[in-house]
């Protein structure tokens, strides 16, 4: 059984399809309630009016992830505001590759940097040496968090949600 919909749809709907298929509806709803309770407890502790960007870095360069994806939905529930460019990706999971000259379009109060493999890590390490990167206000403020690209840009579900919430809590509150 495969849920109908795409990566921009509500992740909870797909989660419920899997719970139904496994005849674990009650357990599935309990897991969603746990996520909601964790969000409700975390949200008031986070800084108000904070903008965030989720940037996936690969060997070709950075892409801004849509604010409508799974992670964007969670960040929105936490009261964190998506960067303007992330809001403009209505029908796509991410922007085109951003040049270093356009990297400022991905700036926010906090940037979560996701990489998928060692080649992406190498490209990110090289970018960190570029003036366009070091001038980002998030970088200047030390508000840069490296996160798992598989979870932050390619996953959804209960375990992924818990990891995203762990990462946000670690970055913004510690």
Regions found by a protein language model. Give the residues of each.
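Extracytoplasmic substrate-binding proteins
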Residues: 1-59, 151-174
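Short secondary-structure boundary/capping segments
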Residues: 44, 72, 135-137
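Ligand-binding pocket segment of bilobal, Venus flytrap-like solute-binding proteins
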Residues: 44-46, 93-116
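Short, conserved beta-strand edge motifs with alternating hydrophobic and charged residues
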Residues: 51-57, 85-86, 113-114
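Redox- and metal-dependent alpha/beta enzyme cores, enriched for Fe-S-associated oxidoreductases
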Residues: 60-61, 71
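Short, well-ordered secondary-structure micro-motifs
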Residues: 63-68, 123-124
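Alpha-helical, coiled-coil/dimerization segments enriched in small aliphatic residues
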Residues: 66-96, 151
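Structured C-terminal subdomain patch of bacterial secreted/periplasmic proteins
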Residues: 106-174
């Amino acid at each position: 059984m495969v849920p109908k919909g795409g990566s921009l749809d509500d992740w909870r709907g797909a989660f419920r399809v899997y719970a139904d298929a496994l005849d674990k509806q009650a357990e599935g709803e309990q897991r969603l309630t746990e996520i909601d309770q964790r969000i409700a407890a975390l949200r008031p502790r986070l800084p108000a009016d904070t903008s965030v960007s989720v940037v996936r870095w690969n060997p070709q360069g950075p892409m801004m992830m849509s604010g409508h994806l799974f992670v964007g939905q969670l960040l929105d529930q936490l009261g964190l505001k998506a960067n303007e460019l992330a809001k403009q990706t209505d029908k796509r999971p991410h922007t085109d590759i951003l040049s270093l000259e356009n990297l400022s379009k991905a700036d926010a109060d906090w940037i979560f940097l996701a990489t998928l493999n060692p080649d992406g890590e190498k490209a990110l390490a090289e970018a960190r040496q570029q003036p366009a990167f070091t001038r980002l206000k998030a970088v200047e403020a030390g508000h840069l968090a490296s996160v798992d690209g598989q979870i932050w840009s390619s996953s959804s579900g209960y375990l992924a949600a818990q990891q995203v919430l762990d990462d946000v809590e670690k970055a913004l509150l510690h």
